[in-house]
Amino acid sequence: MNQISPLAYVHPEAKLGDNNIIGPFCFIDKNTVLGDNNVLQNSVTINRGARIGNNNEIFPGASLSTKPQDLKYKGEETICEIGDNNSIREFVTISRGTASKGTTIVGNNNLLMENMHIAHDCVIGSNIIIGNSTKIAGEVVVDDNAILSAEVLCHQFCRIGGYVMIQGGSRFSQDIPPYIIAGKHRLK
């Protein structure tokens, strides 16, 4: 049985699994799917197109499946797919896809720290840590087991290989191969 605060709004067309906790001032839009055993603390926004798995904890101020910040987006129906066992911290924003790929994907067992952003059509793998205030532009791929420290800026269309570790404050505009420790100055 779901525990939904009387101060939360859940659209009648939203599909909820079992044993979810939805805190006060949460908003769950139509055309959304929420699996089982998720915890939405207060003031979480789940916009249309969200497909959220099981056992995720989503903290205050997070906004998932937001309208893409892409001028080519014309309102087409797209998706933001989030897997299982993720910790999505305060004020994280994740955009849904555009016509380019149609879906933004976040895998399983990730820690997305506060105030970070994942843009449209990104593919974020599993077992990834993304630090505070990191910004990932559109259509970026982050392979499994990568660590992006705080305040990393990632240009669109880049690929970050598996097991990469990126130092805080770094910015880059090209792919980073797997098993690399990268950092500080602009990566070329």
Predicted regions and their residues:
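Structural signal for interior beta-strand "rungs" in well-ordered beta-sheet cores
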Residues: 3-183
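Conserved beta-strand-loop-alpha-helix hinge in the C-terminal portion
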Residues: 185-188
